[in-house]
C-alpha cells in the first residue's frame, strides 16, 4: 500500500485551509465525497452487497464517516453508524453530521461493552472513521 500523505501532514493541510477561509464543513464534505466514491468503485461491477457500516469516533474523523454514509445512503446503500466515544466530547461538526444522519434515518449504534463482532456480519464494507 502506498501512502500519499501521512496523518500529520493531512492535519497541517486541514489547519492551513481552515485558517485561510475554507470552512471545516466544506473540507468534511470533500473528504466524505472521496470516501463514498472509493466505496462505489469497490462495489461497482461486482457482486458485493452494498452494505456499509462506518465506525466513527466523536471527533471530526467520525464526522467525515457520518457524512460519507449519508452520501452512500442517498445512492441506495444500506448504511449504519457505530459510534465509539463519549458524546459529551463530540465536536460541533460531529453533532451537525449526526443530526443529518438522524434526518436520513440511518441506524446508529453506540459502542457498549457487550457489543460483539457479529455486529459487522451483515456489512461487507467497513469505513474507518476513527483514525486520521
Regions inferred by a protein language model and the residue ranges of each:
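Glycine-rich phosphate/dinucleotide-binding loop and adjoining beta-alpha-beta core of small-molecule
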Residues: 1-5, 46-132
